[in-house]
Structures are given as C-alpha cells and as structure tokens.
Amino acid sequence: PYTTLFRSVVSQSMREKGLDYKLNFGIELPRLKEIAARYEKNHEVAQALWKENIRECKILAGMLQPVETFYPEIADIWVEDMRYPEIAELTCMSLFQYLPYASEKAFEWMADEREYFQLCGFMLMARLLMKGNQLTERSEAEFLDQAMATLQSEGVLPRKAAATALKKFAVQSKENGKKVNRLLAPLTKSDKVEIASLAGEIKLETEYWH
C-alpha cells in the first residue's frame, strides 16, 4: 500500500505537469537521484511533491526545485514542515546550499529556537564552510557564539549539527582550529557527559587536520 500510494501520488503529480513518471520501488537515495536527473527542474512539481507527507516525495522535491523560484519565505515553510533529520540533511544538500541567500538563512535559522530551524541552520552552515565560504569577523563571532550555545543546549539534533559545523570551521585554517579549541577547553571538562564527549570529538578532529 505504501509503495502504491507513493507511486500514484508521484505519477499523478508528474502527469498533471505533463511528465510521464514510472517508478519502480526500492527507493534508495542513488535511485532517487537517478529519477530526479531524468527531469528538468520544475517549481510546480517540486511544490506538489513537497506537500505530500511521504519521505521519497520530499527528497525528490528538493532535487527538482529550481533555485530561482525558491523564495526565502518558501524555504521557511519547508523547514516548518520537516519532521525527520534525513529530510533536513538531504534538502540542505540538494537545494538549500545553492540558494543565493543561503548564508543569510543559515544565520537566521541557527538563531531560531525551533529544533528543525536550528538543525537546518547548522547543517547549511557546515555545507557552506565545506565549499570554502569564509566568514567575516562579525559573522564568525556570531557563528561561534551560536554554535557554542547550541552545543550546551538540550536539543540533541541541533547539538550534533552545531558540532559538525564547528568541525568544518575549525579545519578551514590553523587559526580557526585554535579559536575553536580555546572555546572548547572548558566544555571538555563539563559534568554533562554528552557535552564533554562532543567537545572532545571536535577537538580531536581539529588536531587531526592540523
């Protein structure tokens, strides 16, 4: 039933937009990428797919959404809809990191109290740092501030994402590595085991790269 439902939802959505869509099930990520690669990016199709509360539909939506018509307010609506970290991660990877306003959104979302906004904010920041984006002095201070606060917060998902973003920042340069290690020093002695171990893990990776 699940597979049939997915197949019919997607094929109907694609048919309405004039795309012939045949789906064989067993939908792993590489297969979804293959499916998406066969089609032109299409705003209406992507929006229709996103509205379906089905994992594969949401993953495909991120792959088929054109950047040009994906306005900041739609980005917020999508994040509001997210319920699974996998969807957050894949949408950041296939769509969010390519948005012209990606950096602004990363900062806005990192500072948001809502779990999935923070999660996407740090995941997006990690992606941008991996692409070699350099932070200005002011944005660097804001990022480090936000990441350190999140590392010590209760939210497990944002905490892990903040740790990943800190690692990506730290490995960009020796100078960045030193800054991060200085900030982490007190946390490695934290009474909270999970915080101390996350801090230790970031420190270890930073030292490995430098």
Predicted regions and their residues:
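Alpha-helical scaffold domains
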Residues: 1-210
